[in-house]
């Protein structure tokens, strides 16, 4: 759903599933130029060239992770929760259009215990002196991870719950 209005994606979801073979990696890895051109004409999906190409690129990325780690799911599931910035960096570097909030939401949708830097979470982190502005640099992201690790240790709660509580504590 990267960069799209979520309600638009939800309405077009059946079209995406059909066009991209139920999200089976194999056919998407080998998307031909002709198939790509057909996707650009397909009114059942959002016709954005770079995002359509990202299906192929991310199918390759996930397939590579599977070869390296047994499965892409194992790669993400086994990544330590005290370093959630790590898989975000991997997704940004090796995936296509998976940086920023997209990577954060991806982990959450995969069921990975994680945090999301919503506007309200960022406001709390700034107010607490953890960061000075929205965290985009590696240094700032590591500071955020450190603060959330501390809150996890102090509270005994998981990262997802902490992230949600922090988000609801302002606004």
Q: Over which residues does each language-model region extend?
A:
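Alpha-helical ds-nucleic-acid-binding substructure associated with the helix-hairpin-helix region
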Residues: 21-97
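A positively charged, amphipathic N-terminal helix/segment that binds anionic biomolecules
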Residues: 1-23
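Short, solvent-exposed positions on alpha-helices
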Residues: 7-8, 50-53, 160
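C-terminal accessory module of base-excision DNA glycosylases/AP lyases that mediates lesion recognition
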Residues: 76-171
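Hydrophobic (often cysteine-bearing) scaffold residues that line and stabilize catalytic clefts
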Residues: 5, 12, 51, 117, ...
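Short, amphipathic alpha-helical segments that act as regulatory/interfacial helices
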Residues: 13-17, 56-63, 145, 149, ...
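A short structural micro-motif
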Residues: 15-19, 38, 46, 112-113, ...
């Amino acid at each position: 759903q990267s960069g799209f209005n979520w309600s638009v994606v939800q309405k077009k979801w059946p079209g995406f599933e059909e066009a991209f073979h139920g999200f089976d990696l194999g056919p998407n890895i080998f998307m031909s130029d002709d198939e790509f051109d057909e996707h650009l004409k397909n009114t059942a999906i959002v016709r954005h060239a770079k995002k359509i190409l990202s299906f192929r690129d991310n199918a390759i990325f996930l397939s590579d992770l599977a070869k390296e780690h047994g499965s892409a799911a194992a790669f993400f599931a086994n990544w330590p929760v005290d370093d959630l910035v790590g898989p975000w960096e991997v997704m940004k570097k090796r995936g296509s259009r998976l940086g920023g909030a997209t990577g954060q939401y991806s982990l959450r949708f995969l069921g990975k215990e994680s945090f999301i830097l919503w506007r309200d979470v960022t406001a709390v982190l700034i107010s607490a002196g953890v960061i000075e502005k929205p965290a985009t640099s590696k240094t700032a992201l590591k500071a955020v991870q450190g603060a959330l690790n501390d809150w996890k240790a102090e509270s005994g709660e998981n990262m997802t719950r902490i992230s949600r509580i922090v988000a609801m504590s302002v606004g």
